[in-house]
């Protein structure tokens, strides 16, 4: 089952759920396509996450068939700020492995954000700080209002605005860490991580 950009969800929480027919599911709450959403994964299926427990802010994708969720895959580990190794690289491209496809993810800390363009660095120095030297900056179009603000400390996911994106130029050490969700290199969603 192919996964695409229309199924990207920012994970909030999961719980066991039993419906009126006594069928068991994993109830997954998240933010998808500009709204809060709940999906139900049959108990005979598992979330593909390489054994990692999902936490608020992780990015997942799901696939439905005949109205039922058939597959859930973890793409981004928010706590580690790394793309998950879930074996779905043929379905999505991460940080520079950009191809003209229906789904790409770009992550890093914001160096500058102005006039619909964002410069990111995904390279860290030996001290663990983002390196904003010219060779490490990548430029992307970023003209969307589909913005999500993830507070990892308080475990909340809320709608955000463009003014929530803080750049290194303006905020120095308080620059935003973001993930851009793109389709055919057009930014469809910005996920901002704080806390």
Regions found by a protein language model. Give the residues of each.
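...the same signal can extend to comparable exposed beta-sheet modules
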Residues: 1-195
């Amino acid at each position: 089952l192919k996964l695409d950009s229309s199924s990207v969800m920012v994970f909030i929480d999961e719980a066991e759920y039993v419906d009126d027919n006594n069928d068991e599911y994993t109830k997954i709450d998240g933010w998808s396509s500009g709204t809060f959403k709940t999906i139900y994964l049959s108990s005979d299926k598992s979330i593909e996450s390489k054994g990692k427990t999902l936490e608020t802010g992780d990015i997942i994708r799901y696939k439905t068939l005949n109205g039922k969720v058939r597959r859930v895959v973890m793409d981004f580990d928010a706590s580690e700020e790394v793309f998950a190794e879930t074996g779905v690289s043929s379905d999505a491209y991460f940080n520079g492995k950009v191809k003209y496809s229906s789904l790409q993810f770009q992550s890093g800390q914001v160096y500058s954000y102005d006039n619909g363009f964002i410069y990111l660095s995904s390279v860290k120095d030996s001290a663990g700080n983002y390196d904003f030297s010219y060779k490490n900056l990548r430029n992307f179009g970023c003209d969307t209002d589909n913005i999500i603000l993830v507070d990892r400390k308080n475990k909340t996911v809320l709608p955000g605005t463009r003014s929530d994106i803080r750049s290194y130029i303006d905020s120095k050490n308080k620059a935003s860490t973001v993930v851009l969700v793109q389709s055919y290199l057009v930014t469809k969603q910005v996920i901002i991580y704080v806390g």
